[in-house]
């Protein structure tokens, strides 16, 4: 069964080329991080490239413009990971309209709790962009069932009680939790945070519908040549097929 490959890239000066590379390597959905000065959910690797992107003058408008201009060349769906402050500053309606124009499939807003996500959805019933739900391992069953029921696009389960990309084992209850969440939703459930290797992927997709890989891919785009990165992406894609 085909599982979803959801790689993450930081929206920096050359992010659009990275998005195209990921798309060609078989990404189902590419997650594009919007650089932000206080990224509470990001580990050191992503924080560093985010700071660099801010210094390069990258902002949300640059990301929208690049996606709008290049959307016909990108086969994968793509979502933005952004903090609510950026949306609020831009104006919710204007932001959602810009997303639609740029072909954005969904938004992940890590600092917006479920109740506020639901209010945001209710304020914009006409929007075409999905608001993607996050569920952490610390979330109670009752609450995670509610989030799962309300979800659209896909659900992003946080596999570790930590920020992204830190080493460590997956939560022992993780697979059971993912199966439980899947039983309460119509949308795919993908797992992310701390996934790096083909072995990690193989382990987690016993329960999940796919994986999000962030820090590892960001690091490879920063440090490796393109061909080495493509080989890595293919290994992950093969495990997911």
UniProtKB/Swiss-Prot annotation:
<protein>
    <recommendedName>
        <fullName>Tryptophan synthase alpha chain</fullName>
        <ecNumber>4.2.1.20</ecNumber>
    </recommendedName>
</protein>
<dbReference type="InterPro" id="IPR018204">
    <property type="entry name" value="Trp_synthase_alpha_AS"/>
</dbReference>
<dbReference type="GO" id="GO:0004834">
    <property type="term" value="F:tryptophan synthase activity"/>
</dbReference>
<keyword id="KW-0456">Lyase</keyword>
<feature type="active site" description="Proton acceptor">
    <location>
        <position position="42"/>
    </location>
</feature>
<dbReference type="InterPro" id="IPR011060">
    <property type="entry name" value="RibuloseP-bd_barrel"/>
</dbReference>
<comment type="function">
    <text>The alpha subunit is responsible for the aldol cleavage of indoleglycerol phosphate to indole and glyceraldehyde 3-phosphate.</text>
</comment>
<keyword id="KW-0028">Amino-acid biosynthesis</keyword>
<dbReference type="InterPro" id="IPR013785">
    <property type="entry name" value="Aldolase_TIM"/>
</dbReference>
<dbReference type="InterPro" id="IPR002028">
    <property type="entry name" value="Trp_synthase_suA"/>
</dbReference>
<feature type="active site" description="Proton acceptor">
    <location>
        <position position="31"/>
    </location>
</feature>
<keyword id="KW-0057">Aromatic amino acid biosynthesis</keyword>
<dbReference type="Pfam" id="PF00290">
    <property type="entry name" value="Trp_syntA"/>
</dbReference>
<keyword id="KW-0822">Tryptophan biosynthesis</keyword>
<comment type="subunit">
    <text>Tetramer of two alpha and two beta chains.</text>
</comment>
<comment type="pathway">
    <text>Amino-acid biosynthesis; L-tryptophan biosynthesis; L-tryptophan from chorismate: step 5/5.</text>
</comment>
<comment type="similarity">
    <text>Belongs to the TrpA family.</text>
</comment>
<dbReference type="GO" id="GO:0005829">
    <property type="term" value="C:cytosol"/>
</dbReference>
